[in-house]
Amino acid sequence: IDVNVNGTINLLKSIIRNKSQIFINISTDKAADASPLYGNTKQLGERLTSWAGFHIKETKSATIRFGNVIETRGNVFEIWNEELKHNKPLSITEPLMKRYFIHSNEVVEFILNCTIIANMGEIFIPKMGLFTIKELANKISKKHKIIGLRQGEKLQEKLLSAEEELIAVKKSNMWVIKPFK
């Protein structure tokens, strides 16, 4: 709560004080169909950013919602690499679990492009690959162990909520959600 909500509020106060030209909020697919606390706090950060888009006229603002970013700290590949180093089977929560993935290089390019097109609190969601955890694990090793879903974990994350699917504009490489006024 402190980072995702209070941190966003503090950043918005700072952009008002400093008359910043642009504000980009980085979010997660867990905000789309939020149920655990983490997803709800990310969703609130998105809404605060959309609010800023309408009320802070000097600053262009937007949210960028990503899935799992490959080559970042704490991702499944980092965990699997550690397991491989110790000759252990790969930990799989649920073989049929599906997740969206994007490479860190694509993330950087997408953020830079969004700084150009950001305007009034839009949410930009890049198109990402959807894979089952088993499919990914099989590309690395045939030795797996199923550890089960963690509390609050979903079989498949969504990029858009049901309401957002109705209003999202599909572009060649992304979805754009215009904020409600």
Labelled PLM ranges:
Residues I1-T63:
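N-terminal Rossmann-like NAD(P)+-binding domain of SDR-like oxidoreductases, especially those catalyzing
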Residues R47, W51-K181:
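Strand-loop microenvironment adjacent to phosphate/nucleotide-handling motifs in alpha/beta enzyme folds
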